[in-house]
Curated annotation (Swiss-Prot):
Residues 164-334 form the Helicase ATP-binding domain. ATP binds at D177, E178, V179, G180, L181, G182, K183, T184. The gene is rapA. It is an enzyme of class 3 (hydrolase). One of its GO terms (molecular function) is hydrolase activity, acting on acid anhydrides. The keyword Transcription regulation applies. One of its GO terms (biological process) is regulation of DNA-templated transcription. It comes from the Bacteria. Transcription regulator that activates transcription by stimulating RNA polymerase (RNAP) recycling in case of stress conditions such as supercoiled DNA or high salt concentrations. Probably acts by releasing the RNAP, when it is trapped or immobilized on tightly supercoiled DNA. Does not activate transcription on linear DNA. Probably not involved in DNA repair. Interacts with the RNAP. Has a higher affinity for the core RNAP than for the holoenzyme. Its ATPase activity is stimulated by binding to RNAP. InterPro entries: Helicase_ATP-bd, Helicase_C-like, Helicase_RapA, P-loop_NTPase, RapA_C, SNF2-like_sf, SNF2/RAD54-like_C, SNF2_N. Residues 492-668 form the Helicase C-terminal domain. This is RNA polymerase-associated protein RapA. Belongs to the SNF2/RAD54 helicase family. RapA subfamily. It comes from Aliivibrio fischeri (strain MJ11).
C-alpha cells in the first residue's frame, strides 16, 4: 500500500465520510482529510482500512466544482492520477481533471464502482439480495397474487368471486351473498388485488356509521390496508394540506350520512379522483322511478365519476325486484335503463335457468330441455355433447359435457358478470343450530320492582314499556341504585355458573343487550367462581376490544368467557367457539340473527349450542316463544324475519308491554303461516343459475387448493427471518408458531416498513393467525416483507461481495465472477406490466476465461460451499484483479444483450396470448350477452398496445456482483 500526497482514498469502515485526500505521510502513519464531512483520520500506514479510488475509461466522474467528465483516458504520474475526457455539460474535448480536484461527496452507484472503491458487503447479504429479486419476480408472476396474503380462511366461493372480479379492469359488480357468507372479506380481497396490481390507487368505502370501525379493523387486520375514517373534524384538519380534504389520503372510509348531510362535502367527494368505490349495505339506498332517495342520488353521483364500483347488499329476493334493479342501474345505467325492460329480460332467463337445473341434476334430459338448450346456444353445435351425455361414456366424460353446456349457458346469463350471490342452501358445510330454552322462576325482587314500574310508567309508549320489561335487572337497579347486586339472586346467573363449570374446556360467548349488564356479569363470574372472563362493549376503544378478543381466542391461559353487549359484538366473529348464551333477547329478528351470526359463519367446524335462559311469566318468555315457534329464528337463518316482524310489530309490542300471553297463540300461528309463505316465495324466486355461477364449483376448489399449497412455505420463513436479521430487528420466539419482532437500536434504517414502533407478534401459520387477532400473518404480500424487499433493493444492501471457494480440484487463485442483472420495463404500475414483465433477475456466472457457467452451477448449492472474507482482505483481493474483473464484466454485457432480447420476446408473446384470449372471449360473449361493457373491450386493446411499447423499451442493468476466489487453505 503506497501513499502519495493528494491521492484520493475511501474509508472501508466509514464510507459515509465521503472521499478522503492524503494530506500527510510519514514512515508509520498516513493522515487523510475528508472534506465533505470535515473530518480528519490518522491510520497506521501498513494496515490502513482504506481503499484507493481509481476510475476507468467509460466512467463518468464529478469535479469539486460540480461539472461531470466522461473519462476517455487515465494517466498515472508520481503516484497521482489524471483523468482526460469530454465535459458532459459543454461537450468540450480533452478536458483534464486531476484526482485531487474530484468531488468530495462521491457516490458509488454502480455495483462495480462500489466493489473497486472497497464498499464490499457481506456474503450473506449478497445472497439475500438475489433471493429478494427472485421472490419479488415470482410473486408478481403468480396468478394468485393478492389472494394469498389475507388473514382469512380459504373458502372456495369467496376466493372464486375475488379471483374472478379482482383481475378485471375497473370491476363494477354487486355482491349479494346471504348473511354469514363473508361479503366484507370478498370485497377486501378484491380491493387488495386491485391495489397490489396498481389498478386502484385511490379507494373510497362508504358504509353506515355503525360499521365504520368494523370495516377499518377488517381491512387493517385481514388485508393490511390502512384506511382513514373521514368525518367533519378530519376534513377541517385536512384543509392545511389540500383544498379538497379527500385528496389527503389514498384509502378513505366514511359514512353515507356524513356525505349526505353536507352539500359541500358531497361535492368534494365527487370531485376527488377515485379508482374504486365500495358501498356496504347498499340495499338501504331507496329508489323508485319517479323519486330516488337522496342517499341513492349521492352514491349515483360518485359511481358516475368512479371507474370501479362494488356494491354489497342483502339478497335480491329480500330487496324486492324494483330495488334490485336500482342497484344494477348504479353499476351500468346504459345497460339497465328501464325497469319494465329489465323485468321482461329476467322473464326470458327462466328457460336458461331451467335448462341449467336439468343439466346440473344429472338426470336424463327431456326433449323439451334439449330443444331449449339448442335454441339458446343457436350458434354452437350442441348435438355431439348431447350424444356424450346420453351414451354409455365414462361418468367423468359425461360430467364434462354437462359442464361445458352449463358454462356456455352461464355466459349468456344476463347478470352473471355483474351480480354474485351465494346462498347457504347452495354452499354446504354449515353447522346445525341446537336450541336450549331454559325456563326459570321469576325472583320476588324482580316481580315487585316490575309491578311498581308498571304502576309508575303511566306516560310511556307501548314500545318503550315493551323494551323495558325485557330487562328486569335494569328495572330493579332503578329502584335500588347502581350498587344493587341483582346477580346475587337472579336464577339465570346461578344457571350460567353451573353451565360454565360443566364446560370448563369450552369457550363460551355470552351476549347481553346492555353494556352495564355485561360488565356486572363479568364481576359476578369472577367474584363468585373465579371464572376467567373478559368484556366487550361499545365504551371500549378498538385496541381494547382487540385485546379482549385476543384474550378470549388464546387457547392456553385465555379467557373461558367473553361477555358482549349488543353493539359491542357487531361485526366480530368467534367461530372457534360453539357455545352461545343469550342472557337476554334482542327486540327484533335481525339482531337475533346477528348474535347467532357471531358463531354461525362459514368456517365453523361444530354444531352451535344456543342457550336461552328466560324468566317465566315475563315478556322474555313470550318473545322467546315467538322467535322460536313463529319464526324458527333460532334453528335456521331467517331472511324473512324482518318482513314478518314488520307485519305484526304492533301486536308483538302490545303483548310484550303487558307481559300477558293473551293472543300469543294466534300471533304465533299467523306469524308461522306468513313466514312459511314468504320462504316459499323466496325459494321459488331463487336464481339457481346465478348460484351455480357464483360459487364457482370445481374452479373455486382449485383456487383454494393452489393457495393452500403455498401456505407454510419454508422458503418464506427462511427468507423473512434472514431479512429481519439483516435489517437488524430483534426476534424473540414466543412459542405457538409465534415470534415477537421489535425495532432495535442499530437498525439499517430508522424505521422498518409495516412494523409498529412497539413491535408486533407474527406467525407464518394461517390457522394460528385466524384464532389470534393480535398476530400478523406473514406472507409474501405482507407490508413487512414487501417493504423489506424494497428496502434491501433501494438501500443497495448486498450489491457487492467477495467469497472464498475451498476446492482442491481447482487451482488456487482461480477467479469466478457472479453477476446479477435486472431487466426492467419503466411503466406505470396500473398498466399491468408486472403481470408479464416484472423486474426480472438474470444470473451470470463467469469463469476466468469468460464462459458462463450459470446453467451448471445452481445458486443455492454453490452458495453453501462458499466462505466469507473480511472486508480489508476482500478489498486487497479486488484491487489485485481489477483488470480481469473489468474484462469479465465487458463479456457479460455482450451476453446480456442477447438475453435481453429473448426476455422481451417471451414477455410480448405471453402478454399477447393472455390478453388476446381475454379479448376474444369477451367479444364472443358480447354477441350474446349485453352485460359486457364496451370500455372493457377498448381497455384491453389499449392495454395491449401500451404494454407492447413498454416491453419493447425494457432495459437491463447490472444489479449486484460477487468475486469468488479459489483457496486451498
Amino acid at each position: 500500500m503506497s501513499f502519495a500526497l493528494g491521492q484520493r482514498w475511501i474509508s472501508d469502515t466509514e464510507s459515509d465520510l465521503g472521499l478522503g485526500t492524503v494530506v500527510a505521510v510519514d514512515d508509520r502513519t498516513v493522515s487523510l482529510l475528508f472534506a465533505a464531512s470535515e473530518e480528519n483520520r490518522l491510520y497506521a500506514k501498513h494496515d490502513a482500512p482504506v481503499t484507493r479510488v481509481m476510475f476507468n475509461k467509460g466512467d463518468t466522474i464529478e469535479s469539486h466544482e460540480g461539472w461531470s467528465l466522461d473519462v476517455e483516458d487515465v494517466i498515472e504520474e508520481g503516484g497521482l492520477l489524471t483523468y482526460i475526457g469530454t465535459r458532459v455539460d459543454t461537450d468540450e474535448a480533452n478536458v483534464v481533471l486531476r484526482e485531487t480536484l474530484l468531488s468530495h461527496q462521491i457516490r458509488f452507484n454502480k455495483p462495480q464502482d462500489k466493489l473497486f472503491a472497497g464498499q464490499i458487503d457481506r456474503m450473506d447479504r449478497f445472497a439475500l439480495r438475489f433471493r429478494a429479486l427472485q421472490n419479488q419476480y415470482e410473486q408478481h408472476k403468480s396468478p394468485m397474487r393478492g389472494l394469498c396474503g389475507m388473514r382469512a380462511g380459504l373458502i372456495p366461493h369467496q376466493l372464486f368471486i375475488a379471483h374472478e372480479v379482482g383481475r378485471r379492469y375497473a370491476p363494477r359488480v354487486l355482491l349479494a351473498d346471504e348473511v354469514g357468507l363473508g361479503k366484507t372479506i370478498e370485497a377486501g380481497m378484491i380491493i387488495h388485488q386491485q391495489v397490489l396490481s396498481g389498478r386502484a390507487e385511490r379507494v373510497l368505502i362508504v358504509v353506515p356509521e355503525t360499521l365504520q370501525h368494523q370495516w377499518l379493523v377488517e381491512m387493517m387486520r385481514r388485508f393490511n390496508l390502512h384506511f382513514s375514517i373521514f368525518d367533519e373534524e378530519r376534513c377541517v384538519e385536512a384543509y392545511a394540506d389540500s383544498e379538497n380534504p379527500f385528496d389527503t389520503a389514498q384509502f378513505v372510509l366514511c359514512s353515507l350520512d356524513f356525505i349526505r348531510k353536507s352539500k359541500r362535502r358531497f361535492e368534494q367527494v365527487v370531485e376527488a379522483d377515485w379508482d374504486l368505490l365500495v358501498v356496504d349495505e347498499a340495499h338501504h339506498l331507496e329508489w323508485n322511478q319517479t323519486k330516488p332517495s337522496r342517499e341513492y342520488q349521492v352514491i349515483e353521483a360518485i359511481a358516475e365519476e368512479t371507474p370501479g364500483v362494488l356494491l354489497l347488499t342483502a339478497t335480491p329476493e329480500q330487496l324486492g325486484h324494483e330495488s334490485h334493479f336500482a342497484r344494477l342501474r348504479l353499476l351500468d345505467p346504459d345497460r339497465f335503463y328501464d325497469y319494465d325492460a329489465f323485468v321482461e329480460e329476467e322473464r326470458q332467463y327462466q328457460p336458461v335457468a331451467d335448462a341449467v337445473t336439468a343439466l346440473m341434476s344429472g338426470e336424463k334430459l327431456s326433449n323439451d330441455a334439449k330443444n331449449r338448450i339448442t335454441e339458446l346456444l343457436s350458434e354452437q353445435d350442441v348435438e355431439p355433447l348431447f350424444r356424450i351425455i346420453e351414451s354409455s361414456a365414462a361418468e367423468d366424460e359425461q360430467a364434462q359435457a354437462r359442464q361445458e353446456l352449463v358454462d356456455n349457458l352461464m355466459d349468456r346469463h344476463g347478470t352473471g358478470r355483474v351480480l354474485f350471490r351465494n346462498t347457504r342452501a347452495a354452499i354446504k358445510g354449515f353447522p346445525q343450530r341446537n336450541l336450549n330454552l331454559m325456563p326459570m322462576p321469576l325472583p320476588s325482587q324482580y316481580a315487585t320492582s316490575m309491578r311498581v314500574a308498571t304502576m309508575m310508567g303511566g306516560r310511556m309508549t307501548d314500545e318503550a314499556r315493551a323494551m323495558k320489561m325485557l330487562y328486569p335487572e335494569e328495572i330493579f337497579q332503578e329502584f335500588e341504585g347502581d350498587s344493587a347486586t341483582w346477580w346475587q339472586f337472579d336464577p339465570r346467573v346461578n344457571w350460567l355458573l353451573e353451565l360454565l363449570k360443566e364446560n370448563r374446556n369450552e369457550k363460551v360467548l355470552i351476549i347481553a343487550s346492555r353494556a352495564s349488564t355485561a360488565l356486572q356479569l363479568e364481576q359476578a363470574l369472577r367474584e363468585r367462581e373465579g371464572i376467567r372472563g373478559t368484556v366487550f362493549h361499545e365504551g371500549m376503544s378498538i385496541i381494547e376490544r382487540d385485546k379482549a378478543a385476543a384474550y378470549f381466542a388464546q387457547e392456553e391461559g385465555g379467557a373461558q368467557v367473553l361477555i358482549c353487549s349488543e353493539i359491542g359484538s357487531e361485526g366480530r366473529n368467534f367461530q372457534f367457539a360453539n357455545q352461545l348464551v343469550m342472557f337476554d333477547l334482542p327486540f327484533n329478528p335481525d339482531l337475533l340473527e346477528q348474535r347467532i351470526g357471531r358463531l354461525d359463519r362459514i368456517g365453523q367446524k361444530r354444531d352451535i349450542e344456543i342457550h336461552v335462559p328466560y324468566l317465566q311469566g315475563t315478556s322474555q318468555e313470550l318473545l322467546a316463544r315467538w322467535f322460536d315457534e313463529g319464526l324458527n329464528a333460532f334453528g335456521e337463518t331467517c331472511p324473512t324475519g324482518r318482513a314478518v316482524y314488520d307485519k305484526f310489530a304492533d301486536a308483538i309490542i302490545a303483548i310484550l308491554a303487558t307481559g300477558k300471553s293473551d293472543g300469543l297463540e294466534s300471533l304465533i300461528e299467523e306469524s308461522a303461516a306468513l313466514n312459511k309463505s314468504l320462504k316459499a316465495q323466496l325459494e321459488q324466486g331463487r336464481d339457481r343459475l346465478l348460484e351455480v355461477h357464483s360459487n364457482g364449483g370445481d374452479k373455486a376448489k382449485e383456487i383454494a387448493e393452489q393457495i393452500a399449497a403455498t401456505d407454510g412455505d419454508t422458503n418464506l420463513v427462511n427468507f423473512a427471518l434472514n431479512l429481519f436479521d439483516t435489517i437488524g430487528l430483534n426476534q424473540d420466539d414466543k412459542g405457538e408458531n409465534a415470534i415477537v419482532v421489535t425495532p432495535a437500536e442499530n437498525m439499517l434504517v430508522s424505521s422498518y416498513p409495516g412494523l409498529p414502533y412497539e413491535g408486533c407478534t407474527i406467525t407464518f401459520d394461517r390457522e394460528t393467525a385466524l384464532s389470534r387477532e393480535d398476530m400478523n400473518l406473514i406472507s409474501w404480500e405482507h407490508p413487512m416483507i414487501q417493504g423489506g424487499i424494497d428496502l434491501v433493493l433501494t438501500e443497495g444492501v448486498g450489491a457487492t461481495a467477495v467469497s472464498l471457494l475451498k476446492n482442491k480440484a481447482l487451482p488456487a487463485g482461480t477467479l469466478l465472477l457472479e453477476l446479477v442483472y435486472v431487466v426492467d420495463a419503466q411503466a406505470p404500475k396500473q398498466s399491468g406490466i408486472a403481470r408479464f414483465l416484472p423486474k426480472t433477475p438474470i444470473r451470470i456466472m463467469m469463469d476466468g476465461k469468460g464462459n458462463d457457467l450459470s446453467a451448471q452451477v445452481e445458486f443455492e448449492s454453490f452458495n453453501r460451499q462458499l466462505s466469507p472474507v473480511n472486508r480489508h482482505m476482500a478489498s486487497k483481493l479486488v484491487n489485485s484483479v481489477q483488470k480481469e474483473i473489468h474484462g469479465l464484466i465487458d463479456k457479460a454485457e455482450i451476453s446480456m444483450e442477447e438475453r435481453l432480447e429473448s426476455v422481451r420476446t417471451d414477455a410480448e408473446k405471453e402478454m399477447k396470448a393472455a390478453l388476446n384470449s381475454e379479448l376474444e372471449r369477451l367479444q364472443a360473449l358480447k354477441a350474446v350477452n349485453p352485460n359486457i361493457r364496451d370500455e372493457e373491450l377498448t381497455q384491453i386493446e389499449t392495454q395491449m398496445s401500451e404494454l407492447s411499447g413498454y416491453i419493447g423499451k425494457a432495459q437491463v442493468q447490472l444489479d449486484s456482483l460477487r468475486l469468488i476466489v479459489v483457496s486451498h487453505n
